[in-house]
Amino acid sequence: PITDLTIKDNSLIVATQGRSLWMIDDLTVLHQLPNSNKDPYLFKPKPTYRLRGNGGKNSLTMGTNKPNGVEVHFYIPSYEKGSDTVELSFHDEKGNEIKKFSTSDDDNKLEVKDGGNVFVWDYKYPGAEKFEGMVMWSASLNGAKAVPGTYQVKLSVNNFESQNSFEILKSPTSESSVDQMREQFNFVNQINKTISNAHQSIKKIRKIKLKLNEFLTNFSDNSDAENIIKKANFLVDSLSTVENALYQTKNESRQDPLNFPIKLTNKLGHIANLVTINDFPPTDQDKRLMMELSEKINKEIEVFNKLMTSDVSEFNLSFKKLQLDYLIN
């Protein structure tokens, strides 16, 4: 049975006979109820503490934790899947977009129903680029967590738009200062930018190698293409060298890194994984290792870019001069 009720920070707190305290709900939604329910409505999120861990439910005999993130309540009078587009975007204090979720986006999907809706933003900025079949060992490609401060949320329903500001607060249990959190934020963003550049290069490398291998299969017995076949083999080998330096291409399952050593982007992602265990800034050793790995990654990307501007371009010119049929019967 419920033995007591009180309000704390605009949340309803309930005490039960089992000596438990429960935070039932956010009462600010009731304080902001609109006069009409004909139009979409975006409620102003209440100030949210940036906490560690995540909300969840472990078993049927345990209570459900409050979601770890900014709870955004919004109202949609009616939603027709396929014809209506609903978007929820988060912005910094200057209005720069951080992340957008949409009913039409498969990656950042926004689930919507008629009536009241709630979405929880986990404070995170976009993470590093990924590619199909990628296997990493103890690495984080997650986005950096927003630093305590003022932010904006925007709701778009077809031609309707509304926005509100909200506050992310420093957790009273955190021993880090906001400046230290900001230093970690910038550090993780820098890591993710370097990893993204490398993984974008890997995607391009794999597309080029696919085309080159198709060429070698189709024209291996063409005596007129002997020189260009040598160029193709050289390109495949050179591109593979870059790819293998950036990423462990032998990995196919989650346990494969036990047998094959991790490569550059995995090592850099591992630093991000360690740094984000808490709210503290990176150590001097973290910074030095990050710079060392980033330099090695950038050198491999430079090699790839040179191959693109010289050898790949030369291959394309040679292919055109031979007037080879691209499509083989």
Predicted segment positions?
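Glycine-centered tight-turn motifs at strand-turn-strand junctions
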Residues: 97-142
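Contiguous beta-strand segments within globular domains
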Residues: 47-87, 91-92, 118-120, 181, ...
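Short acidic/polar inter-strand loop motif in beta-rich domains
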Residues: 127-131, 156-164
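Low-complexity, Pro/Ser/Thr- and charge-rich linker/hinge segments at domain boundaries
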Residues: 29-53, 165-197
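Extended low-complexity, serine/threonine- and proline-enriched intrinsically disordered segments
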Residues: 85-102, 155
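Beta-propeller blade termini and top-face loops
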Residues: 1-60, 67-69
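Mature extracytoplasmic or organellar-lumen-exposed domains after removal of signal/transit peptides
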Residues: 166, 199-329
